[in-house]
Structures are given as structure tokens and as C-alpha cells.
Amino acid sequence: MRRGLALPVLETTVVSEWVDYNGHMNDAAYALVFSRAGDALMDRIGLDAAARKRTGQTLFTLQVMLHYFKEAKEGDAIAVACHLLEHDDKRMRLWLEMTAPGGERLAASEQLLISVAQAEGAARAVPWAFETKSALDALARAQSDLPHPPAAGAGIALKRKA
């Protein structure tokens, strides 16, 4: 893990099924790509399929905010990188940024996720497993110099003239 950089988690290409009547990637497709990026992150922090089966622990999404900066069109290569904004004993807040090959920002997703144990059909919040907590701590240290994204934590509102 390189210090001071967002963690690359996903590279893909915009497929025709993701393109809408406006000729660009549909808003739901962005959510799908960011969801897949979150799944890829799980593999990097000790929550891969084998660990989920062994421990019964997984992630649930509590909140998501999507930001759209520039259109992505069919055939475009896209990449998603992860900036761990903060974490505690059960939750993490991520800034996932989608870029074009030259680094141009296309979209971002801020996500609040929680550690959950699934046992006997019931889900309940639980502290991170040791391996996951260690991975999150290491990621936080490696990214401690990254600037906080200006839009992170922002809500939605219409700007009003004073």
C-alpha cells in the first residue's frame, strides 16, 4: 500500500447495459460500479468470501451519497479508488472516486458502512474482526496525508440568494 494515495480497487469498462436514453452512463449504473468497488475493498480488508463464510461477518451499507462530475459513455475505461475517511470499532466512511484513464474525475460516492454478523437469520452490528480492524488501521495510516475531499460530508440543498 503506497502512502498518501487512494487505494485502487476496481477497473472496468462502461458496457451498453449501463447506458441510458441520454447516451451516457445511467445513475443506477454508477451506484452498481461503486457497490462493486466496495466489494473489491472487502477482499482487501479481510472480508473476502472465505472470511465471510468462516466468521459470518459482512458489511451492510447505512448511507450513500453520489456525486456526478462528468459523463461516462459506452466503451469508456473507468477506475475506482478508495479513500478511507474515518473508521471506528464497527463503522467506516469511504470516499470512492471514479476516474477516466487520464485521472479526470467522473463521479464519487461517499459511503457509510457497518460491520454486521449474520447468525440464524438475524443481522446485528458487531466490532470488526481483528484482521479487518488491522487492515483498516493500516489503510488509515497510509492515507493520513490525503486531503479531505471538499464534498465529503455535504448534504443536498438548493443554493438560495441572500
Predicted regions and their residues:
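Active-site helix/loop of acyl-thioester processing domains in fatty-acid/polyketide metabolism
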Residues: 29-53
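A conserved, well-ordered hydrophobic junction motif at loop->secondary-structure transitions
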Residues: 21-31
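HotDog/MaoC-like acyl-thioester-processing domains
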Residues: 1-4, 9-10, 68, 73-77, ...
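Short secondary-structure junction/hinge motifs that connect adjacent elements
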Residues: 48-57, 152-155
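Short catalytic/metal-binding and nucleic-acid-binding patches
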Residues: 3, 40-44, 59-64
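Short polar catalytic/cofactor-binding loops
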Residues: 12-20
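A structural signal for short, hydrophobic beta-strand segments that form beta-sheets
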Residues: 61, 82-84
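Small beta-barrel nucleic-acid-binding modules, principally OB-folds
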Residues: 56-74
